Regions:
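A helicase ATPase "motif cassette" and its flanking acidic/Ser/Thr-rich regulatory loops
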Residues: 1-83, 147
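Pre-ATPase regulatory/linker segments immediately N-terminal to the P-loop/RecA-like helicase/translocase core
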Residues: 2-18, 74, 78-201, 257, ...
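Beta-strand cores of modular interaction/reader domains in eukaryotic scaffold and signaling proteins
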Residues: 68, 88-90, 109, 119-121, ...
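Short, conserved secondary-structure segments in the cores of folded domains
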Residues: 77, 109, 333, 555-556
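ASCE P-loop NTPase helicase motor core
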Residues: 93, 98, 124, 174-285, ...
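Conserved helicase motor core of SF1/SF2 NTP-dependent helicases
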Residues: 234-236, 244, 334, 348-629
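Residue-level recognition of conserved beta-strand edge/terminus positions
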Residues: 89-91, 346, 571
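ATP-hydrolysis module of ASCE/P-loop NTPase motor domains
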Residues: 281-323, 380, 594
């Protein structure tokens, strides 16, 4: 084993140890939460639905037993159920000693989730009739063993790789050895700006790895779509992945708009005919051979119910039916995967049995800066070269264990490669979203002042003679934060009132008719879930906001990643005598928050508390300077 190989293997073994710490920490936290957290709190947190109405059970097109349920209460609470997450069903019953919860002895996997409807695939032997008859039925998220198992398997495989492409990429990513490039004259793409053209050309020249670093509003997705389109002129098929289902949906939809055939493994987070049209399950159902396959599957299920005389004739018939079903499944899959130019999935979804044995020339990972390194290796093992796109100055991957975080588990593969191989990185430098004054602080602090505004957005605004960025100081208002629990964080009731007062005042200045005519939209952001829920309740109850509810979104910073609004109002919450700001000291979150605004940014928070931190002191000074104070 040479020095480079030894170094990379050692680093990945350390990654595995840190992942084990995170796994054990999260599993213990889940166990503790399950045992000690009341149902009402789980529902409020979005981790459980109760009560449920059982809608139906059926076999889906992939021959999986599925259960459909809807929640009948607390429909205003945003939930955390999404495709691929494990869940368990329970019943709430009344006993002499009070209410008790009994869990059913099986787990399922979410195959579809929207606002109030959930479809869960369950084992064939799941007691569906009992579920249907249960009063007080509920469902809650279960600990996600699968994602960890896939990450551990991926790390073990890459650690053990010898004398193959995976081993080469592993050693390259952990060394200072330059990545290989092809040499050819740059290709012109007149519809892209100079940095975007450079990024696409760098992707095309890369033999090993390329990185598209896209600060807010710089057209990262546009650039990535063009790079994929051009790559497909040279390769028959590529794999496109992202950490979240939402990110996979977004890039998939843009690729379809570009005229590229996409096959989406897994179900989308939002449902419309366009999104569903390129999912594997919908394409499978639409195949001409599917009705025949469905009939054979029904015959197999019917035959299994014949318990009396399972003689040789029964077994021969069952074998014939199974053989024919497998033959049809293989034929359908061969055609579906053969016709698609892009296979799209989450990083963990790339481990699907549907992709068993498949290799790709190029893997594109979008939002790579939000993914744990171990998750990236799940997909990388299927590819010869890798293109990463994202922004490590925005939201990081979620790491809950402080020990794992301090050990470096939160350091992403994208960050490692950027640090070791700056020559493979292209920074996109023209943003098309924000007024110049909103953008400038972020550009200076996070991107060395290299990001500029496109002329068409530089001076965009809503009101004449209006300062695009405002800070409303709550220091003298009596606003104080309150701790409301580990999962929800903190609230600041007075600040919530001041936040909505600021929005009311601005709406009044704009005028109701103009807001409607110009479809002006608003985002209200807070770092804390409890404050978000408080603000949502206040918006719902306030008569003033009744005409505007369709244009106002209230969410956490994470919930706004990748989105933008004409007006953004940020409630910082923290207000204390000690200058404690908690995870607001992770400045990447604030970079996301302040760069969601196109034309107006209003920050509401305690100057006395926040400006004890250098970043917020600088930001407040910048706001004052912009206002000419």
């Amino acid at each position: 084993m040479n020095n480079i190989q030894s170094s990379s293997v050692q680093a990945l073994r350390q990654q595995r140890l840190l992942l084990e710490i995170e796994y054990n920490s999260e599993k213990e936290a889940f166990r503790r939460q399950t045992e000690t957290t009341g149902l009402a709190r789980k529902v409020k947190r979005g981790d459980a639905w109760h009560p449920l109405r059982f809608v139906r059970s059926y076999y889906n097109s992939l021959n999986q037993l599925s259960v459909e349920v809807v929640r009948t209460a607390d429909t205003d609470i945003e939930h955390n159920f999404e495709f691929g997450r494990p869940v368990c069903f329970f019943r709430m019953s009344e006993a002499a000693e009070g209410k008790s919860i009994r869990y059913f002895n099986f787990t399922g996997t979410v195959s579809y989730a929207d606002g109030d409807r959930l479809v869960v695939t369950v084992p064939d032997n799941a007691p569906v009739a009992e579920l249907q008859a249960t009063e007080g039925l509920g469902v809650q998220l279960f600990f996600d063993e699968t994602s960890y198992r896939l990450m551990f398997e991926a790390l073990d495989r890459v650690i053990g790789a010898r004398d193959n492409r995976l081993a080469y990429l592993r050693d390259l990513f952990y060394s200072g050895v330059p990545a290989a490039e092809l040499s050819f004259a740059p290709i012109s793409f007149p519809w892209l700006n100079r940095a975007q053209q450079e990024a696409v050309n760098k992707v095309l020249r890369a033999k090993d790895v390329a990185i598209v670093h896209g600060p807010p509003g710089t057209g990262k997705t546009t650039t990535l779509v063009e790079a994929i389109y051009e790559t497909l002129r040279r390769e028959s098929q590529v794999l496109v992945c992202a950490q979240s289902n939402m990110a996979v949906d977004w890039i998939s939809e843009r690729l379809v708009d570009r005229g590229i055939s996409v096959l989406r493994i897994g179900n989308p987070t939002k449902v419309n005919d366009k999104m569903l049209s390129f999912t594997y399950e919908r394409r499978f159902e639409a195949h001409p051979d599917y009705p025949q396959l469905w009939s054979i599957r029904q015959a197999i299920r019917k035959l299994r119910q014949e318990r009396k005389r399972r003689d040789n004739g029964w077994h021969q018939k069952m074998d014939r039916l199974k053989s024919r079903a497998v033959e049809l499944e293989l034929r359908i899959n061969s055609q579906l995967f053969g016709e698609a130019k892009v296979i799209a999935s989450t990083l963990t979804g790339s481990a699907s049995h549907l992709l068993s044995g498949q290799k790709f020339g190029t893997l594109f990972i979008d939002e790579a800066a939000q993914a744990l390194e171990a998750a990236c290796w799940i997909a990388i093992r299927r590819a010869s070269r890798v293109v990463l796109a994202g922004d490590h100055c925005q939201l990081p991957p979620t790491v809950k264990s402080i020990a794992a975080l301090k050990g470096g588990l939160g350091t992403t593969l994208m960050e490692r490669i950027v640090a070791r191989k700056p020559s493979v990185v292209t920074l996109l430098t023209v943003q098309y979203r924000m007024n110049e004054q909103i953008m400038r602080f972020s550009s200076n602090w996070f991107y060395d002042g290299r990001v500029e505004s496109a002329p068409e957005v530089k001076y965009r605004g809503i009101l004449d003679y209006d300062n695009p960025i405002t800070w409303i100081d709550t220091s003298e208002s009596g606003a104080k934060e309150e701790f409301v629990g580990e999962s929800f964080g903190r609230i600041n009731k007075t600040e919530a009132e001041l936040t909505l007062d600021a929005l009311k005042n601005y709406f009044t200045k704009i005028g109701r008719q103009r807001i409607a005519d110009e479809h002006i939209d608003v985002g209200v952001i807070s770092p804390y879930r409890a404050q978000v829920q408080l603000l949502r309740r206040m918006v719902r109850k306030a008569e003033f906001f009744k005409p505007y509810r369709g244009c106002i979104t209230v969410n956490t910073v994470d919930g706004f990643q990748g989105q933008e609004r004409d007006i953004i109002v940020i409630s910082l919450v923290r207000s204390n005598d000690d200058g404690q700001i908690g995870f607001l000291s992770d400045l990447r979150r604030m970079n996301v928050a302040i760069t969601r605004a196109r034309m107006k940014l209003i920050i509401v928070g305690s100057v006395q508390t926040m400006t004890r931190h250098a970043f917020y002191k600088e930001l407040y000074g910048y706001v004052q300077e912009s206002a000419g104070i």
